[in-house]
Each structure stands twice: as structure tokens, then as C-alpha cells.
């Protein structure tokens, strides 16, 4: 079990589950992300007005998924393939997101340059993850991006010149449920799968072959998972 990992942990548990499933024949790994972010709600503080941002964005949520290798035909139907996964800590980001356990409980503080730090470094993470499979067109991917908040999504979208529909599922989940920390990326995976089925698209990934899952959180830490969709 993992505790107090923050918003990037949805990617972390997928990476660890992938490793367990690949290295233990016949294994099936149950991944559960459960977040009660309401415990961070506090009254306004003159010294930490930034805490109001997180309190306005966050929400409670839980999601689960099963990870395995070598699916059993006619018994199991995979939804996505986890191709590769990596974690990195962004440079010059120490203290950008802080969490502390105090007498009043768990508190979080966010620096105003968090969206800029993420958007400035995201392309490097993409290149490292996707260069081995020859992808450099970010609009050719389906996107499972941890929402963070609207400012982060806006800056990432602008930095990578993404079409508005690329982050549509992420924005929908943020609007419906708020930032549920680690659980968000699993909600977004399901949203992409559901919309693809509703539209009758050829794959679970909006009709596309390749996708990327991003998780951002304290550190600043980025989890990157390369996804391959399957036939619908």
C-alpha cells in the first residue's frame, strides 16, 4: 500500500503493477486508488492564501483497475496495453507543491509557478518516452493527463500546440468530479474508453493507436506511461 504520494500516484501504481504482472507469470494485480482530499479543507489563512486554490479544485474519489500480462482468450478482454512507464523529478521545482502533517491535519501549499514548471518540462518527458517508437506528433496521441487544474491544462495545451479535443476527457472529469488526486487518471481512462465506444470508434483510445498517460504531483514529480489501445 502507498500513502501520501499525491497527484502523480495514479501513474506510479500503474507502473508498479505493470512490473509485478510482467515478472510473475499468470499474475493479476488489483490497483485501487482511493482519495479523501476533503481532509485538507481548512479556513482561509493570511499566510497561505495559495491553499484556497487546492481547496477549490479538489474532490474525493476512488477507482480500480486490474493489470495483467498474457490475457486469457475468451475470458479476459484488455482495454489498454501499458507499453512503458517512467518517473522523473522536474528540475528547479523543489517546494513547488508541499504537503505537511500538522496538528490541524494534512495541509498543502502550491506555488503560483507550478503550471509553468510543468508545461516547460513536459515536452522533454514526451520525447524521452515516445522517441523509441518514433512518435513526435503529440496530436497523433490520445491523452490521459492528470488535470491538476485549468491553468496547468491551458499551459500544457498551448506549449504542445494540442488540439482542444485532446484534453477534452481530462477537462470533463475535472468539471464533473474535481481533482481527485491519484484516482483522476483512472477516471479519465474510463472516460476515453466510454466515449470511444459510444462513437463507434475502431479502438479504445479515441480511434487512435498510441496514447500517453501523465501524472503530476509533489516533487515536482512526473509519471509518464505510454499506452497502446486495443480494438474496440
Curated annotation (Swiss-Prot):
It holds the Pfam family Chal_sti_synt_C. SUPFAM superfamilies: Thiolase-like. Its EC number is 2.3.1.74. InterPro entries: Chalcone/stilbene_synt_C (IPR012328), Chalcone/stilbene_synt_N (IPR001099), Polyketide_synthase_type-III (IPR011141), Thiolase-like (IPR016039). Keywords: Acyltransferase, Flavonoid biosynthesis, Transferase. Pathway: Secondary metabolite biosynthesis; flavonoid biosynthesis. Coiled coil: none annotated. The active site is at residue 7. GO terms for biological process: flavonoid biosynthetic process; polyketide biosynthetic process. It catalyses: (E)-4-coumaroyl-CoA + 3 malonyl-CoA + 3 H(+) = 2',4,4',6'-tetrahydroxychalcone + 3 CO2 + 4 CoA. It comes from the Eukaryota. GO terms for molecular function: naringenin-chalcone synthase activity. PANTHER family: CHALCONE SYNTHASE 1, HYDROXYMETHYLGLUTARYL-COA SYNTHASE. The primary product of this enzyme is 4,2',4',6'-tetrahydroxychalcone (also termed naringenin-chalcone or chalcone) which can under specific conditions spontaneously isomerize into naringenin. Belongs to the thiolase-like superfamily. Chalcone/stilbene synthases family. This is Chalcone synthase. It comes from Malus domestica (Apple). The gene is CHS.
Amino acid at each position: 500500500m502507498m500513502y501520501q504520494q499525491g497527484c502523480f500516484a495514479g501513474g506510479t501504481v500503474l507502473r508498479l503493477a505493470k512490473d509485478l504482472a510482467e515478472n510473475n507469470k499468470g499474475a493479476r494485480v488489483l490497483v485501487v486508488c482511493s482519495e479523501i482530499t476533503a481532509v485538507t479543507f481548512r479556513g482561509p489563512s493570511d499566510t497561505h492564501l495559495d491553499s484556497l486554490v487546492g481547496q477549490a479544485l479538489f474532490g474525493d474519489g476512488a477507482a480500480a483497475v486490474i493489470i495483467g500480462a498474457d490475457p486469457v482468450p475468451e475470458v479476459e478482454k484488455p482495454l489498454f496495453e501499458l507499453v512503458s512507464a517512467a518517473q522523473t523529478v522536474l528540475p528547479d521545482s523543489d517546494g513547488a507543491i508541499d504537503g505537511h502533517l500538522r496538528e490541524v491535519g494534512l495541509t498543502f501549499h502550491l506555488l503560483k509557478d507550478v503550471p509553468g514548471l510543468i508545461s516547460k518540462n513536459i515536452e522533454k518527458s514526451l520525447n524521452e518516452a515516445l522517441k523509441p517508437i518514433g512518435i513526435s506528433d503529440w496530436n497523433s496521441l490520445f491523452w490521459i493527463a492528470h488535470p491538476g487544474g485549468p491553468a496547468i491544462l491551458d499551459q500544457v495545451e498551448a506549449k504542445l500546440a494540442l488540439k482542444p479535443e485532446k484534453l477534452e476527457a481530462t477537462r470533463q472529469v475535472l468539471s464533473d468530479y474535481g481533482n481527485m488526486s491519484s484516482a483522476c487518471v483512472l477516471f479519465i481512462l474510463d472516460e476515453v474508453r466510454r466515449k470511444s465506444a459510444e462513437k463507434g470508434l475502431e479502438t479504445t483510445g479515441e480511434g487512435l493507436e498510441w496514447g500517453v498517460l501523465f501524472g503530476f504531483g509533489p516533487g515536482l514529480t512526473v509519471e509518464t506511461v505510454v499506452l497502446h489501445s486495443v480494438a474496440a
